[in-house]
Each structure stands twice: as structure tokens, then as C-alpha cells.
Amino acid sequence: MLLCNILSIFLAFSLLAGAQDWKVVRENPQKAFPKTVAAGNYSGIAHLHDDIYAVVSDKSDSALYFNFRIQVNPKTGELEQVENLGFTERTDGTLNDGKFWQGQEKGFDHEAIVKASDSTLVITSEGYCRLKEYPVLPTSANAPKISYQQNLWESRWPSSDFYPNYNFESLAFDSVRQYLWTISESTLRKDGQPATPQNGLANQLRLMRYDWGKIKENRNEENNGKEDCSEQESSKKASRYMTAYAYQMDQPSTHKKADIYVMGVSELCALPDGQLLVLEREAFIPKIKIGAFCKCKLYQINPLNSEEFALKEKFSSDTPFLKKRLLAEWKTGLSLSKRSFANYEGMCLGPKLEDGSQVIILLSDSQDQYAGVLKDWFKTIVIRKE
């Protein structure tokens, strides 16, 4: 028995130690594909199948998501081709038949997307402060019509919890453990002020993990029992399966006055071993626009081996903030001679390379290629666990 206990402890420590060894193999340069990717407001990305990805736009009130074909070099992970194939599903969950259509809801501001199963996606709406599950519809107009499933999940939050344009920007899905992850972009109102160049604060955020397996099991039981729940009641029930952690961002890197300044977590990505990638993004835009920059930092965290932090708890000097490890950082900008400014908002796992390395795909929001100056940039980073 003693030997078994020793072996169990050794195995546990081995797993903990092995969970810290992701490293960047290669950071590839960003690329734009203007001939095959029309100007857009692309803000989130998820892998669907093969080389097809779902991409959401924070300005579209008609397309639920766009189908993108993304091809990478199998040896280096460098982007070879990116193409927008159009959209097949409308924001109300119906099939796009190519005819003019205008939905009843507007202002979704979809920011992130994940594939939760072979038949459903989850999308964040910053405009409605919600996380919502949608069915994946067949792409053929001749396929049988699929109506909304009655047990699709939705979680709404009061807009008063967030500062303007600072709520749900991120989603990640751990398909192995069936966990759905999200985090607010900036500090919640109840927790203080958002970071600015003037106050120099470090945003204190609440990382949230939903036990998707238990949520779906509960919803299936309700459906079998013919229990009809309101959206508000559904959100309350979903919160029973939610666990939270404390995350602290870096402080602003500048103290200059900005016309537009955004500092927050713009995306999450779940790794195969249960760890997460966190994309911290700082965008600084002066009134004259020249001198604008966007600084991105990619961190690795391991919340499953960390102390939890309940939503009702207040931040203090004793708060168990998640330990984070910097994997990569890069800076783009706008000057008289250079127009590389890229506000990266989307991130997901790409393919594995021939040597077993993992590709991370990132996309930026060009604000519809603002003023003809910005571009829809894409980027890949190759990581490996050794």
C-alpha cells in the first residue's frame, strides 16, 4: 500500500512537472490574403474539419459565421493560403439560401467561437452579453431542414456587470475534458477600474470554466422530463457547473495619452493537455493615428492544477492569481513607412505538422480594413511539448 501511495504521488508530481514544457518552435510572420479574403471585421476562429475553419465577425448581423479554408505548410506551419468561402448559416440559425434576408435581432458583436461537438457551436455575443450554442447546419440546400434543438444552451449576463465593449471576447473548448472556458476582456465593474495608460493598473480578471459534459447531461434530463426553462433560469442552472479562477494581466506598457486605448484578454485557446493559452492584447491609437501600436503577449497557464477563486470573492493581496508563463510576444504598428498594425482577436488550434508540432492560428480584426490602411492579417505560431 505504501509503495502504491509513493508511486501515485510520484506520478502526480510527474504530471505537474510535465505540464510546464510547452515551448515555441517557430513564430511565423503575419500574412494578408487580399485576393481571397474580403475586408471584414473578423474576430474569432474555430477549427471545423480538415482545412475548414469557422470565423465570426463582430459587425455581421446576417452571417452567423464564415467558412474559411486555411492551408499551412506541413513542415514549417507557415500560412500558404487563406480563403473566405462565404457563409452557410444565418444569425437566427437558419440556412443561407442566397436570398435577401434581414433578421429581427441586430448588434450581436460576435467575438469568439468554438466547436462544442460535431453538431453544435458556441459563440460569444458582446452586444448581448451572452454565450450561446447554435446547431451546425448541413451545407446543402437540398439537405433536410433542421430546426433549433430545444436543449441548446445559453448563458446571459447583465450588461451592468461590464464596462462598455469590455465583456465576453474569448472562448476556448477542451474537447478531451469537455470544458468550456471564457474570461471577461477587462476588469468587471465590481472589481475596480479597467487598465489605462494613466492609471497604470493591471486588469484583474475572472477566468471561468463550465463543465460542458454536466451541463449537457442536465439539459438532456430536463428535455426528457419535458421541463421548460426560461433563459434566465437556464443561466442560473448553468452557473452550478461553473468554476472560476483569478487571472491578472500585465500593466500597460505606455503612459502616453491615447485617442483609443484597449487593454484586455482578446482570446483563449485550450491545449490538448488541459492547459490554456491566453492572448493579452494592448492597442494604443493616438489621435493622429501615426504611432499606433498593438502589443500581443501569449501566455501559458494551468488552471486545472491551480487554486480556484469563487466569483463572490473579492480581489485582495492574498488572491491566488494563476501563474503564467510567457511563450511569445510581438508588436505591430503604424508609421509613415510601415503599416503592420494588427489587432489580434481570434486564436485556435490548427493542424499538427509532420514532426508532431502543434500550429496555433491567429487572426486580426482590421475594422473592415479601416481607411484602406489596415489589413486582415493572419499569423501562425508553432509550439511543441517535449
Regions from the language model: what does each represent?
Residues 1-21:
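Bacterial Sec-dependent N-terminal signal peptides
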